[in-house]
Amino acid sequence: MVVVRLARGGAKKRPFYNMVVADSRRHRDGKFIERVGFYNPRATGGEESLRIQMDRLNHWQSQGAQLSSTVSRLVKQFGRQQKPA
């Protein structure tokens, strides 16, 4: 099954997550099909903390990809950020 999930990157104590489309049997940080965004929980000031390519995410969902619970929460958060702008 294909899933959209977070792959951890960054340094020790400084996490950075890539939002990736991957086969569910692969390791969390292993080989992935496509990168569709990122999440930086430690963003400060004017740094961008969340970016999602919604067109690519919608494409993969239409192909049957499942969202992880965390990615689902972040997509909702991203939608709320985009409405006022």
Curated annotation (Swiss-Prot):
Cystine crosslinks: none
A GO CC term attached to the entry: cytoplasm
The organism's place on the tree of life at top rank: Bacteria
Presence of the UniProt keyword ATP-binding in the record: no
Biological processes per GO annotation: translation
Residue runs in coiled coils: none
Signal peptide: none
Pfam families reported for this sequence: Ribosomal_S16
Annotated Gene3D superfamilies: 3.30.1320.10
Annotated InterPro entries: Ribosomal_bS16, Ribosomal_bS16_CS, Ribosomal_bS16_dom_sf
A single MF term (Gene Ontology): structural constituent of ribosome
Keywords: Ribonucleoprotein, Ribosomal protein
Family recorded in the similarity comment: Belongs to the bacterial ribosomal protein bS16 family.
Protein name (database record): Small ribosomal subunit protein bS16
Source organism (scientific name): Nitrosomonas eutropha (strain DSM 101675 / C91 / Nm57)
Upper classification of the organism: Bacteria, Pseudomonadati, Pseudomonadota, Betaproteobacteria, Nitrosomonadales
